[in-house]
Amino acid sequence: MLKFILIFSFSIIVTTAKAQTGKLPCSNPVYRQFDFWIGEWEAFGPDGKKAGDSKISVILDSCIIFEEWTSASLQQGLRYAGKSFNTYNAATKQWQQTWVDNVGGTNEYMQGKFQNNQIIYTSTPFKFTKDSMAIRKMTFTNISPVKLRQHGEISMDKGISWSTEYDLEYRRKK
C-alpha cells in the first residue's frame, strides 16, 4: 500500500509540475545534446565492411534515446542484436547508458559527458576475468549530419591506458 501511495504521489507531483510549467520534464536543452545520433544508420568497421544497422529514436516523452542494433552477419548461427537506453541524469549531471543484448550481455555506463561535439561514456569497474577488473569507455563523435563515429575502448589498468574494442563509422541511411 505504501508503494502505491508513493507512486500515486509522485505522479501527481510530476503532473502538477508539467501543468504549472507547460513543459515536459526532459525539455531542457541538455537532454538534446545527443540528438545527433537520432535516425537510421548503417555502421561500418575500419576495414569498410558493414558491421550492422542501428535505429535510434526518442521515447518516453523525449527523456530516453533508444537504440536498436542488429549485426550485419551471423556469428555462430546467431544474428547479434541489442538495445540501449540513454538518458541525461539531471541529479548527477551525467549521461547514462544501459545496454542489453540477445546473448545475455549487459553494459552500464553511469558516467557520461558532452564535450567538443562528443558524448563520452565511462563504465564503473567490472570483473573482466576471474582475476582482473576492467573499465570501458565509449565515445560518440558527431562528424557531420550524415556521419558519426562510435569508438569502444577497454582499460585493464584503471584507465591509465586504453585498447580499442571496436571502431565504427555510422552513415545515415537515405
Residue ranges: model-predicted function:
Residues 19-174:
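Hydrophobic small-molecule pocket/channel-lining residues, especially in calycin-type beta-barrels
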Residues 1-23:
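Bacterial Sec-dependent N-terminal signal peptides
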